[in-house]
Curated annotation (Swiss-Prot):
<comment type="function">
    <text>Catalyzes the reduction of the glycolytic intermediate dihydroxyacetone phosphate (DHAP) to sn-glycerol 3-phosphate (G3P), the key precursor for phospholipid synthesis.</text>
</comment>
<feature type="binding site">
    <location>
        <position position="253"/>
    </location>
    <ligand>
        <name>sn-glycerol 3-phosphate</name>
    </ligand>
</feature>
<feature type="binding site">
    <location>
        <position position="137"/>
    </location>
    <ligand>
        <name>sn-glycerol 3-phosphate</name>
    </ligand>
</feature>
<dbReference type="InterPro" id="IPR013328">
    <property type="entry name" value="6PGD_dom2"/>
</dbReference>
<feature type="active site" description="Proton acceptor">
    <location>
        <position position="190"/>
    </location>
</feature>
<keyword id="KW-0594">Phospholipid biosynthesis</keyword>
<dbReference type="InterPro" id="IPR011128">
    <property type="entry name" value="G3P_DH_NAD-dep_N"/>
</dbReference>
<dbReference type="Pfam" id="PF07479">
    <property type="entry name" value="NAD_Gly3P_dh_C"/>
</dbReference>
<keyword id="KW-0521">NADP</keyword>
<protein>
    <recommendedName>
        <fullName>Glycerol-3-phosphate dehydrogenase [NAD(P)+]</fullName>
        <ecNumber>1.1.1.94</ecNumber>
    </recommendedName>
</protein>
<feature type="binding site">
    <location>
        <position position="277"/>
    </location>
    <ligand>
        <name>NADPH</name>
    </ligand>
</feature>
<keyword id="KW-0560">Oxidoreductase</keyword>
<keyword id="KW-0547">Nucleotide-binding</keyword>
<keyword id="KW-1208">Phospholipid metabolism</keyword>
<feature type="binding site">
    <location>
        <position position="255"/>
    </location>
    <ligand>
        <name>sn-glycerol 3-phosphate</name>
    </ligand>
</feature>
<feature type="binding site">
    <location>
        <position position="11"/>
    </location>
    <ligand>
        <name>NADPH</name>
    </ligand>
</feature>
<feature type="binding site">
    <location>
        <position position="254"/>
    </location>
    <ligand>
        <name>NADPH</name>
    </ligand>
</feature>
Length: 329
């Protein structure tokens, strides 16, 4: 059995390494040849996962054909805004009915498409079998083999059971959920809430504020999710509540760090000069316009959007949230 992992960021490298350590024939596609050579020659990904030596059994290449040819499973771990273009470039290397597991978190800008829609549209004619992997995970902690649980959203029971077995280890527990739409949306929207929580912490607003943002964040997830066909109950699970709590409270969260710096007075363009992929920045824009299109009220998302893209003062945004019309929970 061969597994092709597309994307060698921190999360892609961690998942590929986890699979290789378990004994699976795992091939990692690395976009930059220089980084690919480093991984091959030293066993380290110094750019995205510098603290961990990778399994000597992990194979990597910058040639997508070499990585994908003959693969039984395809794990997609590229930034959400680049998934469509990556699949367009690589479509020729997918077989018919490929087993595709997506671990990218986000909503596509301009189209408002979740990752499942991007995959189905990009691989039209190939009839992919689709699953989405999400949940409360920091790459660093999984690489350190700290106990971790995530969820696989998949409507195909056979594929769900296969992937669950492939990924499960003594330190990584995989649950399944047929609601892949809810699983993927939870993993995307929580990044917006993490930015909001980071800003609140940067403003020294305290634990009460953070708890309110997390709780009302779940409400926003559920409202948008139901409007897009997801089950509200999914957002109380690992990809919703679990991931939301982790990214709103954990210092390893890149989205929370962006919010923290904004709350401390830094400007977004300064923050983005750092080499960190904070999916929530683009996802905020995508979800803001998607919610307008669907007529779904997302007050936290709206204020985060105004801070990021209209230079609104974070403290003023929080005050505006608190002074909205009073209503039932």
């Amino acid at each position: 059995m061969k597994i092709a992992v597309i994307g060698a960021g921190a999360w892609g490298t961690t998942l590929a390494n986890t699979l290789a350590k378990k004994g699976h024939n795992t091939h990692l596609w690395v976009r930059e040849q220089e980084l690919c050579d480093e991984i091959t020659n030293t066993g380290y990904n110094s750019v995205f996962l510098p603290d961990f030596k990778l399994s000597p059994d992990l194979k990597c290449s910058s040639n997508p054909q070499q990585v994908m040819e003959g693969a039984d499973y395809f794990l997609l771990v590229v930034p959400s805004q680049f998934l469509r273009s990556a699949l367009a470039d690589m479509k020729q290397y997918f077989p018919q009915n490929p087993a595709v597991v997506c671990a990218s978190k986000g909503i596509e800008l301009n189209t408002g498409a979740p990752m499942s829609q991007v995959v189905f549209e990009s691989l039209e004619g190939l009839n992919p079998r689709f699953a989405h992997l999400s949940g409360p995970t920091f790459a660093y902690e999984l690489s350190a083999e700290l106990p971790t649980s995530i969820v696989l959203g998949c409507g195909d029971e056979k594929l769900a059971a296969e992937v669950q077995d492939i990924f499960s280890t003594p330190y990584l527990r995989i649950y399944t959920n047929p609601d892949y739409r809810g699983v993927e949306l939870g993993g995307a929207i929580k990044n917006i809430m993490a930015i909001a929580a980071g800003m609140a912490d940067g403003l020294k607003f305290g634990h009460n504020t953070r708890a309110a943002l997390i709780t009302r964040g779940i409400a926003e997830m559920s409202r948008l999710g139901e409007a897009m066909g997801a089950q509200a109950s999914t957002f109380m699970g690992l990809s919703g509540m679990g991931d939301l709590v982790l990214t709103c409270t954990g210092d390893l969260s890149r989205n929370r760090q962006v919010g923290l710096k904004l709350g401390q007075g830094m400007k977004l363009n300064e923050i983005l000069k750092m080499r960190m992929v904070a999916e929530g920045v683009k996802t905020t824009e995508s979800v803001y316009f998607l919610a307008k299109k669907l007529g779904v009220e997302l007050p936290i998302t709206e204020q985060v959007y105004k801070i990021l893209y209209e230079d609104k003062d974070p403290a003023t945004a929080v005050c505006d949230l608190m002074n909205r019309d009073l209503k039932a929970e």
